[in-house]
Amino acid sequence: MTKGNANQPVSYPIFTFRWLAIHGLAIPTVFFLGAITSMQFIQR
């Protein structure tokens, strides 16, 4: 979230791991939240 991170690529060697961690958790979370929310409307 710091501006100009592309200016210092050496300062972010863990960018790939961070990206995988964020998306690996965010994608299933959004999916389950959407599924649960849709189920609430489908049941009633």
UniProtKB/Swiss-Prot annotation:
InterPro entries: PSII_cyt_b559_bsu, PSII_cyt_b559_CS, PSII_cyt_b559_N. One of its GO terms (cellular component) is chloroplast thylakoid membrane. GO terms for biological process: photosynthetic electron transport chain. It is a single-pass membrane protein. The keyword Metal-binding applies. Keywords: Chloroplast, Electron transport, Heme, Iron, Membrane, Metal-binding, Photosynthesis, Photosystem II, Plastid, Thylakoid, Transmembrane, Transmembrane helix, Transport. Heme binds at H23. With its partner (PsbE) binds heme. PSII binds additional chlorophylls, carotenoids and specific lipids. It is found in: Plastid, Chloroplast thylakoid membrane. It comes from the Eukaryota. Pfam families: Cytochrom_B559 (PF00283). The chain crosses the membrane at residues 19-35. Its cofactor is heme b. GO terms for molecular function: electron transfer activity; heme binding; iron ion binding. Heterodimer of an alpha subunit and a beta subunit. PSII is composed of 1 copy each of membrane proteins PsbA, PsbB, PsbC, PsbD, PsbE, PsbF, PsbH, PsbI, PsbJ, PsbK, PsbL, PsbM, PsbT, PsbX, PsbY, PsbZ, Psb30/Ycf12, at least 3 peripheral proteins of the oxygen-evolving complex and a large number of cofactors. It forms dimeric complexes. This b-type cytochrome is tightly associated with the reaction center of photosystem II (PSII). PSII is a light-driven water:plastoquinone oxidoreductase that uses light energy to abstract electrons from H(2)O, generating O(2) and a proton gradient subsequently used for ATP formation. It consists of a core antenna complex that captures photons, and an electron transfer chain that converts photonic excitation into a charge separation. Belongs to the PsbE/PsbF family. HAMAP family: PSII_PsbF. This is Cytochrome b559 subunit beta. The gene is psbF.
